[in-house]
């Protein structure tokens, strides 16, 4: 029977040691809560950090970019600009389309933003053109966010117009109703319509004009209320044949009489079933298709949204004819799941490595089981808190748990090692557990709260970067806190029941060999430490050198923002000469598609040509290249992009810009390259002067590649210069001229055909097959005030000019975006600095302002990094100062930090990695890790001075030897916890590797140096404290 120690021993652990059943059940409750939480947690690529974003699209077929800007975009922008919480407003006005993107503050709920947008649209309605075919339509989506899923719909037996009609009605609408879906777009533009192609010569010969035809069609096809009859006994609803449904009915429409004979529409026009917009087209691989892109709402969970679509697809495709084939070409969640699976595997690997290192040091199965239980218990228990905080299982939270593997075992190791030491001295397990746990309790609290203090500044980071790492910091802090609780409750209780002198003394051949090895290492360390203490100034110079070296490395290391991920999808923009037509662009696109599909890494390709709100001009095309899974291709995405661009360079007359899709999207515009830089002015003239000059300079910079601009001001324009005096004499107004031109060349939507399921348009235009180009303008006829027909050429001259193909605004002012990539041998920091230097040399006028796009977040993150690290150090100093009731000891502990910085930065440079936000988080974590060596040394040195009356030198020397094994064990555990991240090669490895590299490098260097520098600095500050006390005492005596 064991004699129980006094109730004063054991500290907070005593209750749990003495009540094993209650302690066990408490831990089981934590375990069950964590398991339930894990099953309830959603899965995503990254924490949800999207800005609330809404896109407003207005289509006005036939309108020029200038008309779209002044008549549609500007009135809407004025209303939107008055909304509270608006962070940024950008717009793009192109031929027939206006797209306004509204990005709100992170704190504004999306539903509130939606209400404000709807109110603003309502307020602007009276200012918009009266003949606008449809009112502005808004969607809760970020247009720069790549689709979560892309589907291609093809058919070998049906025309594309019928295919799109069925897909829009039976598939797209249903998918739009799924929770989390923000927008479903159908690219390909094959919406059914009745197209009326007027024969200009025929109507001119009959003395008619296109306006006569338009008036006749709109008057003949109506769908309005007619009333009802209510008699004494019966009620009758009135109806009529006021609707025409088919092209054949329109052919028979009488548009005028001449000499008593009817003139039917079919006599002067070709009337056929066709597409609403003939200048739109989409292809899947080499086959014409309807391409369906599904985008999520900002903040929606991508995995659950995609799962819902997958579940609904079989049911939707069953409603389509068998000749219609629906193919899922890309699904971003495939790579997200693979990335999360790889991270989970690395987490399990980290746990296995940590348990292995524990056994290597403790050489005892019962002693290994105890921390082996503490690690998974701490990690699994964290899931319960994550559910409560609405977190998700994503790459960052799993990275936090992987790193936590090395952290959470530290507490258990320190407790076990201390209790084992007393058992080996002959004390009973229960007494040793009470004594050891009570003695080490303060150290555990110091380790825990000082490490959590390092994470506090991460919670106060602003904007999107702060939101991004909040889940990481809190997840890690919760795991560390649960670990501390487990180490002060379950660990000493298990030590009291599972450890004994016999089990600790029982050794096999491996145990004896490893014991001798550790004894030799400790002896060698003791000899080295004695020499270092005899030459303190040399050691201090090494410590100062690491501080200076860390500053130099910080200055010179390449800096980036966020690792470029390989998600298996490449977005592309194909650019042709600005005067390119739709037919010309479609042909070039097919040539490029043939080249791309020959690459062995490419699985499928979708492409789109035309202007419909997603593409700005006819001379550009959008491409989405879907790569094979990572394990089925030899190269990562950057090498594939380089290879594709080299191959496409052989296609004449086109430029191809490619960039890999990323899980983190900050910009609101689809860009040609990875990074953007904007020039904003008060007028388009200022941009036309300075953009070419800046582009010329930037294209010469070696720090940039793929430099391009969306400034296109060489679009061909046929300017109709009307002689107003001549027109007025003939009774012809400018409205008559505009109407005649719009009727002929605007694919004008003049009437609507209503059916039970959908609505279709009647499109009016001139048949220009026999009069191509500017010659078609000679066929335009106008009606004078006396009823005569007047050629347009008699009152107007046609001038060929140049004008912008699209007009972009940022916060209501003209803007152009310069896109660029960064070559492999340079960093984003180099590129940003080179752009800023170039900007200074040009001496831009004051009315031109510049701003970075996604790189603005990089500048903001980089600017706050130093303060973030300073805040972490200050937070730790405050916590340690409170815990030790000392101003000096925290400085001794913090003196270990420069060594970690040197190791991390050197490792990143050797590995060729940039110092990005992921690596910076690793350095901040190192601040919390490496100080534990000093804490364990100083705690025992102070206890030896206080309880055994040792001198500071003897106390710190003994503390270093006594704590060498747990220090080495905990450092190796943390290192092995980060090792799987450093060696990661699977999907999403680009995101995880910088964290692992920085931590492994920092831990190795700090472990080697702090074992020697910390004792010397401890003695230095001890002498400084004695000298300060003596000075104060002398002053008091003199006083």
From Swiss-Prot:
The GO molecular function terms of this record are: xenobiotic transmembrane transporter activity
List the membrane topology term(s): Multi-pass membrane protein
- Keyword Zinc carried by entry: no
Cellular component (GO) terms are: plasma membrane
- Positions of transmembrane segments: 15-37, 345-362, 367-389, 396-418, 438-460, 472-494, 535-557, 866-888, 908-930, 967-989, 999-1021
Q: One Pfam family this chain carries?
A: ACR_tran
Give its localization: Cell inner membrane
* Domain of life, per lineage: Bacteria
What are the UniProt keywords, alphabetically?
A: Cell inner membrane, Cell membrane, Membrane, Transmembrane, Transmembrane helix, Transport
HAMAP family for the chain: MdtB
Give the family from UniProt. Answer: Belongs to the resistance-nodulation-cell division (RND) (TC 2.A.6) family. MdtB subfamily.
- NCBIfam families (alphabetical): PRK10503.1, RND_permease_2
Q: How does it assemble?
A: Part of a tripartite efflux system composed of MdtA, MdtB and MdtC. MdtB forms a heteromultimer with MdtC.
Q: Which PANTHER family match?
A: MULTIDRUG RESISTANCE PROTEIN MDTB, PTHR32063
Q: Write down what this protein is called.
A: Multidrug resistance protein MdtB
């Amino acid at each position: 029977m064991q004699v129980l120690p006094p109730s004063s021993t054991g500290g907070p652990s005593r209750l749990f040691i003495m009540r094993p059943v209650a302690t066990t059940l408490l831990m089981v409750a934590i375990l069950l809560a964590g398991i339930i939480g894990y099953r309830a947690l959603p899965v995503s690529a990254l924490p949800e950090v999207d800005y609330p974003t809404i896109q407003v699209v207005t289509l006005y077929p036939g309108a020029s970019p200038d008309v779209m800007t002044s008549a549609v975009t500007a009135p809407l922008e004025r209303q939107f600009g008055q909304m509270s919480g608006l962070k940024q407003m950008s717009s793009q006005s192109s031929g027939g389309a206006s797209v306004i993107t509204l990005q709100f503050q992170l704190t504004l709920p999306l539903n509130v933003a939606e209400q404000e947008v709807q109110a603003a649209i309502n307020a602007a309605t009276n200012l918009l053109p009266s003949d606008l075919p449809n009112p502005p339509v808004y969607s809760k989506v970020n247009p720069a966010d790549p689709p979560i899923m892309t589907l291609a719909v093809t058919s070998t037996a049906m025309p594309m117009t019928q295919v799109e009609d069925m897909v829009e009605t039976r598939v797209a609408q249903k998918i739009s109703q799924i929770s989390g879906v923000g927008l479903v777009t159908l690219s390909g533009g094959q919406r059914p319509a009745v197209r009326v192609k007027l024969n200009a010569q025929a109507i001119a010969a009959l003395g008619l004009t296109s306006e006569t035809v338009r008036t006749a069609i709109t008057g003949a096809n109506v769908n309005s209320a007619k009333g009802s009859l209510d008699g004494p006994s019966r009620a009758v609803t009135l109806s009529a044949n006021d609707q025409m449904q088919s092209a054949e009915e329109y052919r028979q429409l009488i548009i005028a009489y001449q000499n008593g004979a009817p003139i039917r529409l079919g006599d002067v026009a070709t009337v056929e079933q066709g597409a609403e917009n003939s200048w739109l087209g989409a292809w899947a691989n080499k086959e014409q298709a309807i391409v369906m892109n599904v985008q999520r709402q900002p903040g929606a969970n991508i995995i659950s949204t995609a799962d819902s679509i997958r579940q609904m697809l079989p049911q939707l495709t069953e409603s389509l004819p068998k000749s219609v084939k629906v193919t899922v070409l890309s699904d971003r969640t495939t790579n997200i799941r693979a990335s999360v699976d790889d991270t989970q595997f690395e987490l399990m690997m980290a746990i296995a490595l940590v348990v292995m290192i524990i056994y290597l040091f403790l050489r005892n199965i019962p002693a290994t089981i105890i921390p082996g239980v503490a690690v998974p218990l701490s990690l699994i228990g964290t899931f319960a808190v994550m559910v409560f905080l609405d977190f998700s299982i994503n790459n960052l939270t799993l990275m936090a748990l992987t790193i936590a593997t090395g952290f959470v075992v530290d507490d258990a190791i320190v407790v076990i090692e201390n209790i084992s030491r007393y058992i080996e001295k002959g004390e009973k397990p229960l007494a040793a557990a009470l004594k050891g746990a009570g003695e080490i309790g303060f150290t555990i609290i110091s380790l825990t709260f000082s490490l959590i203090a390092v994470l506090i500044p991460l919670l106060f980071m602003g904007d999107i970067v702060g939101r991004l790492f909040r889940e990481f910091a809190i997840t890690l802090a919760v795991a560390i806190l649960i670990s501390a609780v487990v180490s002060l409750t379950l660990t000493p209780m298990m030590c009291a029941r599972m450890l004994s002198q016999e089990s600790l003394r029982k050794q096999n051949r491996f145990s004896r060999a490893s014991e001798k090895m550790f004894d030799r290492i400790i002896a060698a360390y003791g000899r080295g430490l004695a020499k270092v203490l005899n030459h303190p100034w040399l050691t201090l110079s090494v410590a100062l050198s690491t501080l200076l070296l860390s500053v130099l490395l910080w200055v010179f290391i390449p800096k980036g923002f966020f690792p470029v991920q390989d998600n298996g999808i490449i977005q592309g923009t194909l650019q042709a000469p600005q005067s390119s037509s739709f037919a010309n662009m479609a042909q070039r696109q097919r040539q490029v598609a043939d080249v791309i599909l020959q690459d062995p890494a490419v699985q499928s390709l979708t492409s789109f040509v035309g202007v419909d709100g997603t593409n700005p001009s006819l001379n550009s095309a959008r491409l989405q290249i879907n790569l094979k899974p990572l394990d089925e291709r030899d190269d990562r995405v950057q090498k594939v992009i380089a290879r594709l661009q080299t191959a496409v360079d052989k296609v004449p007359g086109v430029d191809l810009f490619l960039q890999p899709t990323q899980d983190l999207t900050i910009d609101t515009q689809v860009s040609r390259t990875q990074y953007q830089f904007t020039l904003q002015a008060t007028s388009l003239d200022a941009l036309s002067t300075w953009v070419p000059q800046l582009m010329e300079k930037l294209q010469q910079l070696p720090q940039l590649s793929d430099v391009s601009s969306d400034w296109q001001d060489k679009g061909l324009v046929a300017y109709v210069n009307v002689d107003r005096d001549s027109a007025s004499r003939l009774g012809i107004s400018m409205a008559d001229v505009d109407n005649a031109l719009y009727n002929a060349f605007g694919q004008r939507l003049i009437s609507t055909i209503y059916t039970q399921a959908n609505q279709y348009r009647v499109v009016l235009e001139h048949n220009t097959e026999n009069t191509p180009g500017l010659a078609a303008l000679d066929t335009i006829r106008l009606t004078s005030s006396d009823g005569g027909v007047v050629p347009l050429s008699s009152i107007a001259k046609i001038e060929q000019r140049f004008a912008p193909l699209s007009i972009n605004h940022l916060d209501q002012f003209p803007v152009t975006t310069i896109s660029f990539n960064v070559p492999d041998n340079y960093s984003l920091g180099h590129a940003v600095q080179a752009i800023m230097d170039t900007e200074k040399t040009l001496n831009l006028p004051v009315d031109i302002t510049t701003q970075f796009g996604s790189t603005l977040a990089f500048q903001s993150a980089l600017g706050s990094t130093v303060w973030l690290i300073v805040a972490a150090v200050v937070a730790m100093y405050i916590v340690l100062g409170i815990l030790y009731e000392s101003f000096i000891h925290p400085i001794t502990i913090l003196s270990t930090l420069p060594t970690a910085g040197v190791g991390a930065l050197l490792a990143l440079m050797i590995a060729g990695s940039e110092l990005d936000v992921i690596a910076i988080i690793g350095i901040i974590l190192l601040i919390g890790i490496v100080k534990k060596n000093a804490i364990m040394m100083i705690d025992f040195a102070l206890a030896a001075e206080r309880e055994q009356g040792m001198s500071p030198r003897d106390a710190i020397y003994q503390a270093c030897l006594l704590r060498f094994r747990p220090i080495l064990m905990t450092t190796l555990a943390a290192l092995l916890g980060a090792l799987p991240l450093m060696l990661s090669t699977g999907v999403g490895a680009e995101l995880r590797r910088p964290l692992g590299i920085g931590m492994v490098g920092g831990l190795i260097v700090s472990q080697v140096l702090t074992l020697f520098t910390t004792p010397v600095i401890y003695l230095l500050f001890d002498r400084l404290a004695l000298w300060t006390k003596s000075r104060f005492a002398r002053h008091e005596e003199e006083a």
